[in-house]
Amino acid sequence: MLLASKKLIIVTTSHRPTQRVRSFVKDLASVLPYAVKVNRGKASLLDLYYDAMAVGAKRIVVVGAKKGNPGIVRVYAPREPPEIGLEEIAVISLSGVKLRREHQEAQKTFNTRSLGIDVRGIGDEIVRRIADTLVRAFLAKLVVFDEDVEKVDVLAKLRIEEKELVTTFICSTTGRVCGPTLRIIAVRDNVAGYRVYIPGAGRQKPT
């Protein structure tokens, strides 16, 4: 059941999720702006479309599992009229995640109104493109300068680690982890028209 208040993002699972996927969805919803977690049940994508229209949501985020763990995040934008339905705007492939409770000294965050994607000091073209995709997918803002940090509630910090782009959500006021960690290995951006793979991010060119 959706909340009566206006929401920007609906976060849910694919059908028959594992407990770990459910926990991840709850964590992810807590750090996205004006997001609400919805239990999928037997709801179809069309059902989710009407849920989104009812609360004015601009995004539907669906988390799928691979071997029981969160493995893929599909992001849809509801379009009008209903015959158009949902447009898949991005697909984020994960090698794994770390839940908020698995971080030492992590804190909970409530009523997140704004998310910033931190690109300060990042010159890698691949990472910058993925940052742009995350901004589009999660209705976030790019944090380019230090003074931008205070304008967001949650800050997503990006770093290349081995062959993954590690994305960690930080409370902007305390500097403590307040959400899950995503280990991104590939991104498909259907709006910008590119697909990016993380291995060799410092060397390969976007396609």
Show where each model-derived region lies.
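Phospho-regulatory, Ser/Thr- and acidic-rich intrinsically disordered linkers and terminal tails
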Residues: 1-207
